[in-house]
Amino acid sequence: DAKGVYELLMGEASVEEVTCSTEIETLKIIPSRVDLTGAEIELVNRESREKVMKQALTGIDEYEFVIIDCPPSLGLLTLNALAVSNSVLIPMQCEYYALQGLSHLLKTLKLVKKSINPDLKVEGILLTMFDGRTLLATQVKDQVQKYFSDFLLKSIIPRNVRLSEAPSHGKPIMLYAGRSRGADSYVELAKEIISRSKSDVRPKTSLTGSAA
């Protein structure tokens, strides 16, 4: 089997050994498998366990953006991602419990910034699975705008059938349905993130997670 994130964190493979090319020439990935769930347990007794990923990714400087996709929980793996990242992109479903979890997540990020990674900042809050036809989605959007306007991105990812179908075909939305409304929304997001990062000359290491 091909090696991935688990082997990288366990010190069994280098970044070069686990990096894979994709159909998109400028996009490379480091895959993960179900065995990554075991890494959390194995890292518990490791010295400086919250910085294992940072050490593993040392020397990566040929990429403009490094995006770490995190699970919707604040466990040790997510903490490792926070320790190595310059900024955090927070995707938030337009649902009630996600709104509740957002305040808790932002408080946690402040603690991480204070104790582990002083360079960490919030890149923005991204509203996802938005359906303007529902009252709840509109209410959640209004609440985020009211209380977290400094962080709220202009880009919004709508609820879209093509976006839902793409993973089952093993393709990113740009290859599966590049002219769909869902694809257009991600293009706008990419433009917004690039525009916001132009003043930062460092290689950009961001992570995504979930507010709830």
Locate predicted features.
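P-loop NTP-binding core
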Residues: 1-212
